[in-house]
């Protein structure tokens, strides 16, 4: 049977008219007067009593120990309000454990064996639940893959989760759930299975839980609530058609004595007022909230241009309140949001609370989208400068403001929904988060979803172990994306436009957001990530333990007096007139870490007096690398910061530290996180990193990385989090199109600058080398390319391209790529560029012979060697063959970029000059160890010519990393011209 609290009974008698205190207990009776000796049974009955007594004096409803199974959500309205001098309080009596439950106890179940360790029992007809609690712990639904606490994504994921081979085992999967990561790991998405086709293809609906939707991630996906997947201890399945509960009890669980609970309600307590008639001065104190249903399929509402959608609800729900307080409560294992603060709320405080294992957000503040003057969505490109609403600030007051989250411990939120945060702030103003410890979460610890309307303060918080299941994010994340961002007709990099329109950038971000005196650590992103136009921020006294600090786009950011341990400052895609200030910080890297386009003019408004830490540095010296990049930093230095005790997390600097002379001011290292003794005793703290000992003198060295070309476009590998964020990629992989000349083969195929190549012929492309391998394997057949452009995937086809074949032989007797006879070759004159080749004379490269020697080789460490061939006149080139010898078993590999020029006179050696030279092919055979001799052949698809050129340059790069870089022992170069037509 299902046991619920007793129903409300009897009206309130006159005997309670002057009472200030009421009592409730699960073993009480609603027929009782509500005294400590004769308490009520239900909270609804106690609420009636409090309503009658409120307003004349403080009213307190004391809850005695036990579980209060709510028949329906307990709803407070303006009729429940107190006053400043006569507040209304609902609290646990003498700290007794009082639990508010949205569930139901399943009693007297008769368990019997089913199979393979699984038991079954009949439950009341009509019972539905999406969670099962056994002895107070939520158990996993029957799922695939099985739950594994050590797996990063979903505690178990598999690419074949919904493959036909898998689903063929499922008789009726309707009602099952699919959970998957966004393709770019920007949160999660969820689906309900609606059926299965005859070909075992699953039918489903959902995926709307992300404001920038995508296909499911190919690897990070799982299914649950599938009967046939019930195969691991702890898993359960409820067959609602037969009202049968199946459970695989873990070792040590005795179901004859265990407490079994199902979940019924989404919301446990609701505060439902309005701006005109708010719920006022009501406190909830010292209670435990448990058994709230999951709401991931109701998470549908897009939140303007953040990446989020939301469900406006939670275990504790506030809308339309003034001066209410949630204090010293434990919100445990609720299925959706723990606390949701919706639309109009003023001076709401959440203090001293312990929030653990929520399915959704910890505490979410979300205002009304219609309070924004320009509530644009991602697909809305209709706004234009000429018609823009230029009125600063919000349009209405229907949003949270002047609210506080104080001294709270919040961890392991986002157990189900991955686009969530322990503290979420969106369409709000003046939210303060103070002395909170936040950790073990899938995405950011604190997220501010837009610039509307600022005034938030994040201080003395300890936030770490974040972004554990997602990517391209930080322990703190914010987006701006305000009225000015991406506005049609507005170019804020233009000097005149900036002068005339600079006020636009603070129309929404009307108040400054302050982050101060916090400790952050993110091992899967940035410690602090001010993303996509985040503007009007002040960051002071932040200790960043791992991921550094990022500013992307945006305006008016002050970055001062922060410490970036083992990392540095990441400026991404700055506006020319950003007005950013970066000063008096301590960092590890001797250079900035930009991504995307940075202005050619001096960066920001001020970048100076920063210190690059070098332990045991004898004397401070200029931070030349910072200064060269920013064109500022005239007074920034490299020096020993002289930390007090960094191994123990004390990054204050000692007296006499050079940082103090730069304006750095010590800030406390012992006030991060919760201060409440009960919470501090159980709160974790971050691992203090082992300090890196950076090298380098701060000067910028010339880049030794060779330039890469594909289809005559310059490309490079995607590198690191910066690129992933700058180009909005699904991972830290791909090939970026750096430059796509108008007449290049890439341009003809439809490629553009800043395209990122993610796949070729269905195979993931992680690097340039991988792309070249796939291209060469295709040997002239059309290439199907998946391109990432402006957050979308675009299919392109490349039919016209050069490719290479390679042959290895133990002797000069090549079969597929033999030395061509003289009659097929273009006569040529060979030259070597500075610093000149060694050993054999350069002329041997065109003598028609292969030898076992070094050939005209470049010295070790020469990274810019080049050979140039003059054909005497421009000729149509059918094939280029290049031969090498594996001298000393390490010089046979070929690594060069082949360039061509049709200039009538010698074009010189600067192959990078696209006016004179065209890149023909990028070749690298290092992947396969050579035998004695190596031959390569470069041809064009469709038996077309490689081009019409007189001059050819082989820009060679060392083929090994030994001895400073050993160059290839080239033996012969042959040019086969196209037959005359």
Stretches with model-predicted labels:
Residues 71-78, 85, 89, 538-648:
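Predominantly extracellular beta-rich ligand-binding scaffolds that present long acidic/polar faces
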Residues 264-273, 278, 293, 297, ...:
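Aromatic, loop-rich ligand-recognition surfaces of beta-strand-rich domains
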Residues 21-332, 371-395, 649-653, 657-699:
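Extracellular polysaccharide-degrading/modifying enzymes targeting complex plant/algal/animal polysaccharides
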Residues 716-759, 763-766:
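PDZ/PDZ-like domain segments forming the peptide/carboxylate-binding groove
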Residues 107, 111-120, 262-272, 301-316, ...:
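Extracellular beta-strand/beta-solenoid scaffold signature
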Residues 752, 758, 763-764, 769-813:
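PDZ-domain C-terminal substructure recognizer with occasional recognition of PDZ-binding tails
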């Amino acid at each position: 049977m299902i046991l619920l609290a007793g129903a409300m009974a009897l009206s309130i008698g006159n005997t309670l008219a002057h009472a200030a205190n009421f009592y409730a207990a699960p073993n009480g009776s609603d027929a009782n007067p509500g005294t400590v000796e004769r308490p009520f049974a239900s909270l609804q009955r106690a609420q009636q009593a409090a309503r009658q007594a409120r307003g004349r004096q403080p009213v307190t409803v004391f809850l005695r120990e036990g579980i209060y199974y709510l028949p329906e959500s307990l709803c407070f309205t303006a009729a429940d309000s107190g006053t400043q001098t006569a507040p209304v309080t609902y609290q646990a009596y003498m700290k007794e454990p009082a639990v508010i439950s949205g569930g139901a106890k399943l009693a007297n179940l008769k368990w019997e064996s089913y199979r393979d360790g699984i038991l079954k029992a009949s439950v009341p007809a009509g019972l539905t639940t999406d969670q099962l609690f056994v002895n107070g712990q939520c158990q996993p639904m029957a799922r695939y893959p099985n739950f594994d606490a050590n797996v990063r994504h979903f505690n178990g994921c598999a690419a074949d989760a919904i493959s036909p081979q898998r689903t063929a085992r499922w008789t009726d999967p309707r009602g099952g759930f699919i959970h998957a990561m966004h393709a770019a790991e920007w949160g999660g998405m969820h689906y309900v299975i609606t059926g299965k086709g005859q070909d075992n293809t699953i039918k489903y609906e959902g995926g709307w839980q992300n404001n920038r939707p995508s296909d499911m991630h190919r690897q990070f996906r799982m299914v649950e609530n599938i009967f046939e997947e019930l195969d691991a201890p702890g898993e359960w399945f409820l067959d609602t058609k037969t009202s049968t509960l199946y459970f695989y009890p873990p070792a040590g669980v005795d179901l004859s004595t265990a407490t079994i609970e199902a979940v019924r309600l989404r919301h446990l307590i609701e505060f439902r007022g309005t701006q005109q008639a708010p719920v006022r001065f009501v406190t909830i104190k010292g209670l435990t909230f448990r058994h709230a249903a999951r709401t991931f399929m109701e998470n549908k509402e897009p939140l303007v241009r953040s990446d989020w959608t939301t469900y406006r609800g939670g275990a504790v729900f506030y809308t339309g309140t003034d001066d209410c307080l949630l204090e010293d409560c434990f919100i445990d294992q609720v299925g959706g949001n723990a606390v949701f603060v919706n639309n109009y709320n003023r001076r709401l405080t959440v203090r001293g609370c312990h929030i653990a294992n929520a399915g959704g957000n910890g505490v979410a503040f979300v205002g009304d989208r219609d309070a924004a003057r320009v509530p644009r969505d991602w697909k809305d490109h209709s706004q234009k400068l000429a018609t823009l609403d230029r009125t600063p600030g919000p349009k209405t007051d229907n949003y949270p403001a002047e609210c506080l989250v104080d001294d709270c411990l919040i961890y392991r939120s986002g157990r189900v929904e991955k686009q969530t945060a322990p503290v979420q702030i969106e369409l709000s103003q003046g939210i303060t988060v103070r002395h909170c410890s936040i950790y073990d979460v899938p995405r950011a610890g604190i997220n501010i979803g837009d610039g509307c309307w600022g005034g938030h303060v994040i201080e003395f918080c300890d936030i770490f172990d974040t972004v554990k299941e997602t990517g391209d994010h930080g322990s703190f994340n914010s987006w701006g994306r305000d009225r000015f961002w991406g506005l049609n007709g507005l170019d804020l990099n233009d000097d005149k436009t900036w002068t005339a329109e600079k006020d636009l950038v603070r129309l929404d971000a009307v108040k400054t957001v302050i982050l101060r005196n916090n400790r952050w650590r993110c091992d899967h992103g940035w410690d602090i990530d001010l993303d996509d136009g985040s503007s009007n921020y002040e960051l002071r006294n932040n200790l960043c333990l791992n991921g550094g600090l990022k500013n992307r786009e945006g305006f008016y950011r002050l970055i001062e007096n922060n410490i970036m341990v083992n990392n540095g400052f990441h400026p991404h895609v700055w506006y020319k007139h950003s007005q950013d200030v970066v000063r008096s910080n301590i960092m590890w890297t001797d250079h900035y870490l930009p991504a995307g386009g940075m202005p050619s003019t001096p960066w920001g408004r001020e970048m100076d007096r920063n210190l690059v830490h070098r332990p045991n540095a004898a004397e401070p010296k200029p931070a030349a690398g910072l200064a060269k990049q920013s064109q500022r930093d005239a007074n920034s230095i490299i020096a020993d910061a002289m930390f007090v005790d960094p191994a123990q997390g004390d990054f204050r600097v000692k007296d006499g530290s050079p940082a103090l002379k730069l304006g750095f001011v010590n800030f406390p290292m012992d006030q991060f996180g919760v201060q409440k003794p009960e919470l501090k005793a159980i709160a974790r703290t971050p691992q203090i990193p082992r300090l890196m000992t950076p090298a380098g003198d701060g000067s910028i060295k010339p880049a030794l990385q060779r330039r890469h070309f594909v289809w005559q476009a310059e490309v490079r590998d995607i590198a690191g989090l910066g690129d992933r964020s700058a180009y909005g990629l699904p991972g830290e992989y791909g090939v970026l199109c750096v430059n796509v000349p108008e007449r290049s083969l890439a341009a003809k195929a439809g490629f553009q600058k800043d395209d990122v190549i993610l796949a070729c012929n269905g195979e993931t492309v992680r690097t340039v080398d991988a792309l070249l391998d796939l291209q060469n394997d295709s040997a002239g057949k059309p290439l199907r390319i998946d391109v990432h452009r402006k957050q979308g995937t675009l299919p392109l086809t490349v039919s016209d391209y050069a490719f290479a074949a390679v042959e290895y032989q133990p002797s000069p007797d090549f079969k597929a790529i033999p030395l061509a006879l003289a009659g097929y070759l273009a006569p040529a004159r060979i030259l070597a560029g500075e610093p000149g080749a060694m050993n054999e004379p350069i002329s041997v490269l065109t003598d028609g012979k292969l030898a076992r020697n070094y050939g005209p080789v470049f010295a070790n460490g020469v990274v810019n060697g080049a050979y140039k061939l003059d054909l005497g006149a421009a000729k149509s080139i059918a094939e280029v063959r290049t031969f090498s010898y594996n001298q000393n078993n390490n010089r046979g590999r070929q690594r060069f970029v082949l360039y061509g020029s049709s200039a009538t006179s010698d074009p010189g050696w600067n192959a990078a000059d696209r006016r004179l030279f065209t890149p023909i092919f990028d070749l690298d055979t290092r992947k396969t160890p050579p035998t004695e001799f190596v031959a390569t052949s470069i041809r064009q698809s469709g038996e077309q010519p490689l081009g019409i050129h007189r001059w050819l340059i082989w820009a060679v790069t060392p083929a090994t990393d030994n001895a400073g870089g050993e160059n290839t022992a080239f033996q012969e170069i042959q040019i086969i011209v196209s037959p005359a037509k």
